[in-house]
Amino acid sequence: MATLESKLEQMLIAPVEALGHSLWGLEYVQAGKHSVLRVYIDNENGIFIDDCADVSRQISAVLDVEDPISTEYTLEVSSPGVDRPLFTAEQYARYLGETVKVQLTMPVAGSRNLKGTVAGVEGQMLTLTVDGNELIIALDNIRKGNLIAKF
């Protein structure tokens, strides 16, 4: 059975791409009456506030018609930012050699929170170098992953 997030992703790809952007990813966070649907959009030319507003209007219309979420929620549309969340194997592969932080569902090497360098991606497996050790992590074990920005 498809998750709500995967259904939402399939529903929102076309309207986001119709406006010339790509759907980087999304998160649906349930918090009682304060649930939030975060939609991240990207574009090789960057994302501006007007882009977020345009996409928000477009996908709000789709969400109003399709009504995939039965409870009240807040819609947030933004760029992934410098500490961008990572959702897919392709996104991790794009940042080979970069530092990421991951929160895991099940511990790996005794920890659910890891910070390391992306050493490789093969299929749905991420190789992360943490303190000189290579750890292989299934992408479906990653609850949340973020790029660590360099300054």
Curated annotation (Swiss-Prot):
Gene Ontology cellular-component terms for this entry are: cytosol
- Compartments where located: Cytoplasm
Cystine residue pairs: none
Q: Which UniProt keywords apply?
A: Cytoplasm, Ribosome biogenesis
For this protein, the record's InterPro entries field holds:
Ribosome_maturation_RimP, RimP_C, RimP_C_sf, RimP_N, RimP_N_sf
Q: Which Pfam families match?
A: DUF150_C (PF17384), RimP_N (PF02576)
Name the Gene3D superfamilies on file. Answer: Ribosome maturation factor RimP, C-terminal domain, RimP-like superfamily, N-terminal
**GO BP of this protein:** ribosomal small subunit assembly; translation
Residues spanning the membrane? none
Q: Which domain of life is it from?
A: Bacteria
Q: Which family does it belong to?
A: Belongs to the RimP family.
Query: What's its job?
Result: Required for maturation of 30S ribosomal subunits.
This protein is called what? Ribosome maturation factor RimP
* Species: Shewanella loihica (strain ATCC BAA-1088 / PV-4)
Give the taxonomic lineage as stored in the record: Bacteria, Pseudomonadati, Pseudomonadota, Gammaproteobacteria, Alteromonadales
Q: What is the gene called?
A: rimP
